[in-house]
Each structure stands twice: as structure tokens, then as C-alpha cells.
Amino acid sequence: MRWLMRKCIRCGRYTLNHDRCPYCGGELIVPHPPRFSPEDKYVAYRLEMKIKTGILDLNKIPVYDP
């Protein structure tokens, strides 16, 4: 599926352009999250990359404050 909307990472505005933001000239990204599938075959690779880059720390105990 081809996404039409883009979001500027500099000013946060949405646009239909695909190259640069017409307001500030910033870089554009696709603001839509990837589709979810319970049969995702790449989840192990994503988890490994998050651990290696430090985004996910498995040694840290999560604190839940109800």
C-alpha cells in the first residue's frame, strides 16, 4: 500500500509532498505505524536490534505504579 501523507520531522506538520516539507524544508517520514501480524517472522530480529542498540534493557526491572 502506498502512503500519501508524510510528516515533517523538523516542524511536525503533515503534507502530501514526498521529497521535502513545503513549510520549512525539513525531511519527511511516513507517520503510519507498520501493520501488526501475530505471525510476524521478523520479531526476533527487531528484538535483537533493540537490545543491541540499548533501546530495550532486559536487566532493568519494570516498575508498575497502579
Swiss-Prot record:
Entry keywords, A to Z: Ribonucleoprotein, Ribosome biogenesis, rRNA processing
Cross-referenced SUPFAM superfamilies: Nop10-like SnoRNP
Any one GO molecular-function label of the UniProt entry: snoRNA binding
Key word Acetylation present: no
One annotated GO biological process: pseudouridine synthesis
Protein name (record): Ribosome biogenesis protein Nop10
HAMAP family attached to this UniProt entry: Nop10 (MF_00803)
